[in-house]
C-alpha cells in the first residue's frame, strides 16, 4: 500500500518477530516437557532443539514444509483427541465437576469469566486477532492457494481447529490446577498431567507427536522469517541481486533467526508472554496502518488491481507503525496503541508529501 522501502523494512522486522517468538516458543515448550520427564536443565534442551530446527529448515524449503505440515498434522489431530480424553478424565469430562474441584482448592475464579475485566478480555482478543493478521505464515499460504475459495476455506478450517485445540489445552491447564494446586511452575502444567495421568504408550506417542508438531511449526516459521527478511530488508535495497544470491541470504538468515529464537526462549518468562509481546508489537503497529490503507482511498479514482489507491504517505506509514508498536508495548496497551497508530497515520499523511509516481513497483508494500 505504500511505495516506501523504509516502511517495508520496518514491517519486515516486526513480522519476523512473530516468527522468532513462535520458534522460540516451540523450543521452550519442548524444554519444559523434557525437564519434567527427566529433571534436566531445560536451557541446553532449548538450545539443542533450536539447532535441530535450524538444520531441518536450512536443508529444506517451503515444499517440504507444506507436506510435512499436512502429513504430521493428520497424525497429531488423531492422537490429540486421545490425549485430551485421558487429560480430562480426572474431572469426568464435566465442567461442573471441574468447577467443584477448583472451588475445593481455592481457585474457583479460573472456572468463570465474571471476575475478568472487560478491558482485559478486549485487550487479549485484539492482541491475538491483530497479531495473527500480521503473521506472514498465513498470508504465505493464502497466496500459495490455487484460488481465493481454497484460501478462504483453508483459513476457516484452520481457525476453527485453532479455537478448539487452544480451548482444550487451556482446560487441561485448569484441570492440572484442580488436581495439583501446589505445582510450582505453571509452564509445566501439561507435562505434569501427561506424566501422571496418561498411559505410558500414549505418553510416548504424544511426546513424539509434540516433537513432530514442533518441528513442523518451527520450520514453517523459520522459513517464513527468512523470506520476510530477504524480501523486505535485502531485495528493496539491493535490486540487482540474483535469485541464487537471495536464496543464499535466506539460508544465512535462517541461522540468524534461529539464534535469536534461542535467546528469546531462554530469557522469556513464559511461552504465552513471549507470544503476547510479539503479537502486541506487530499487531499494534502494522494492522492499524493496513486497515487505514484499505479504507482510506483516494477519491475520484477507480480501483485498479496492482496499483496503490491508498492516501497513506511514506512518513504516515512509518510513524504509524512505530508509534503503534511502542504504545502497544507500554502500560497503555494495544487498544490505545491501535487507536493512536491509526490517528498518527492519517494526520501525518495529511501533512507530508506522497511518494513520487515514478518510483517502481518493487518498492510497494
What is each of the regions a protein language model found here?
Residues 1-365:
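Membrane-embedded helix-loop-helix hairpins and adjacent transmembrane boundary segments
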Amino acid at each position: 500500500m505504500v511505495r516506501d522501502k523504509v516502511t517495508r523494512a520496518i514491517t519486515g522486522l516486526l513480522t519476523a518477530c512473530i516468527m522468532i517468538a513462535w520458534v522460540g516458543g516451540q523450543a521452550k515448550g519442548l524444554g519444559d516437557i523434557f525437564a519434567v520427564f527427566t529433571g534436566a536443565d531445560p536451557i541446553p534442551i532449548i538450545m539443542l532443539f533450536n539447532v535441530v530446527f535450524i538444520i531441518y529448515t536450512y536443508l529444506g524449503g517451503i515444499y517440504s514444509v507444506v507436506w510435512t505440515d499436512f502429513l504430521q498434522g493428520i497424525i497429531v489431530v488423531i492422537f490429540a483427541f486421545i490425549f485430551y480424553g485421558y487429560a480430562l478424565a480426572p474431572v469426568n469430562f464435566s465442567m461442573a465437576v471441574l468447577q467443584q474441584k477448583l472451588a475445593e482448592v481455592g481457585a474457583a475464579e479460573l472456572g468463570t469469566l465474571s471476575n475478568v475485566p472487560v478491558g482485559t478480555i478486549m485487550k487479549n482478543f485484539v492482541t491475538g486477532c491483530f497479531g495473527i493478521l500480521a503473521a506472514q505464515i498465513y498470508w504465505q499460504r493464502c497466496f500459495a492457494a490455487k484460488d481465493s475459495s481454497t484460501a478462504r476455506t483453508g483459513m476457516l478450517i484452520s481457525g476453527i481447529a485453532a479455537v478448539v485445540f487452544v480451548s482444550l489445552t487451556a482446560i487441561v491447564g485448569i484441570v492440572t490446577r484442580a488436581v495439583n494446586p501446589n505445582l510450582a511452575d505453571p509452564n509445566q502444567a501439561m507435562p505434569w498431567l501427561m506424566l501422571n495421568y496418561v498411559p505410558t504408550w500414549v505418553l510416548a506417542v504424544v511426546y513424539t507427536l509434540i516433537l513432530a508438531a514442533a518441528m513442523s511449526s518451527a520450520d514453517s516459521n523459520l522459513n517464513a522469517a527468512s523470506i520476510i527478511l530477504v524480501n523486505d530488508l535485502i531485495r528493496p535495497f539491493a535490486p540487482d541481486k540474483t535469485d541464487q544470491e537471495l536464496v543464499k541470504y535466506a539460508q544465512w538468515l535462517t541461522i540468524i533467526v534461529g539464534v535469536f529464537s534461542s535467546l528469546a526462549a531462554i530469557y522469556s518468562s513464559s511461552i504465552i508472554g513471549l507470544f503476547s509481546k510479539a503479537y502486541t508489537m506487530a499487531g499494534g503497529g502494522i494492522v492499524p496502518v493496513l486497515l487505514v490503507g484499505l479504507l482510506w482511498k483516494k477519491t475520484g479514482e477507480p480501483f485498479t488491481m496492482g496499483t496503490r489507491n491508498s492516501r497513506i504517505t511514506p512518513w504516515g506509514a512509518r510513524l504509524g507503525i512505530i508509534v503503534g508498536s511502542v504504545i502497544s508495548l507500554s502500560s497503555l496497551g494495544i487498544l490505545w496503541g491501535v487507536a493512536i497508530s491509526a490517528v498518527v497515520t492519517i494526520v501525518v499523511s495529511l501533512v507530508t508529501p506522497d511518494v513520487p509516481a515514478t518510483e517502481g513497483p518493487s518498492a510497494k508494500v
